[in-house]
């Protein structure tokens, strides 16, 4: 099943998953585009284009659009990484925080990365406790390679078999 992944309990290709995320209205209307998904789902590259729909009064990208560009990717990556291992998990973005460091007056690039070490930590805690929360950071970088925003996301993962025994 190489190159095939699951989306909403449907088996889809990486290409189709990318297409579905790119036409999802909250991302589409904010001009957020998923450009690349690595074969192993450990990395995703996203672009947030400055456009009429996402500009604020100062003609920079609205902070809510930047925050939206950070939202769905880490949980999606974890879902597919573990689905490829045959492990069904319940995954949520539990918490998020963002720091706006500079006005975003151009297109922003975001690189989401999960390391092999992150996967080992998650697997170990899932095996011992049935659930885990892990933090990740992503930077929103403008065309001059300046970090305009830094977001931290807390991803909650729980073994699906234990959903009745564990709380959120």
Each predicted region: which residue ranges?
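Alpha-helical membrane-targeting segments
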Residues: 2-29, 51-53
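Catalytic strand-loop segment that frames the active site of acyl-thioester-processing enzymes
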Residues: 29-61
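Hydrophobic residues positioned within well-ordered beta-strands of beta-sheet architectures
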Residues: 46, 94-96, 110, 134-136, ...
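Short, charged, low-hydrophobicity "junction" segments
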Residues: 15-21, 46-53, 82-95
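Short structured motifs
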Residues: 29-34, 94-100, 121-123
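Hot-dog-fold acyl-thioester-processing enzymes
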Residues: 47, 53-76, 88
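Hydrophobic beta-strand-centered segment that forms part of the acyl-chain substrate-binding groove
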Residues: 77-116
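HotDog/MaoC-like acyl-thioester-processing domains
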Residues: 104-105, 115-168
């Amino acid at each position: 099943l190489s190159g095939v992944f699951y989306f909403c309990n449907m088996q889809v290709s990486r290409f189709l998953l990318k297409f579905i995320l790119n036409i999802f209205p909250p991302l589409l209307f904010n001009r957020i585009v998923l450009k690349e998904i690595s074969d192993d789902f450990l990395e995703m590259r996203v672009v947030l284009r400055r456009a009429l729909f996402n500009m604020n009064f100062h003609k920079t990208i609205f902070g809510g659009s930047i925050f939206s560009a950070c939202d769905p990717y880490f949980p999606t990556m974890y879902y597919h990484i573990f689905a490829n291992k045959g492990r069904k998990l319940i995954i949520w973005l539990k918490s998020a925080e963002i720091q706006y460091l500079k006005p975003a007056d151009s297109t922003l690039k975001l690189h989401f990365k999960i390391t092999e070490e992150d996967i080992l930590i998650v697997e170990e805690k899932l095996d011992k406790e049935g659930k885990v929360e892990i933090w990740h950071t992503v930077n929103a970088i403008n065309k001059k390679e300046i970090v305009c925003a830094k977001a931290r996301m807390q991803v909650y993962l729980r073994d699906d078999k234990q959903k009745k025994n564990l709380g959120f």
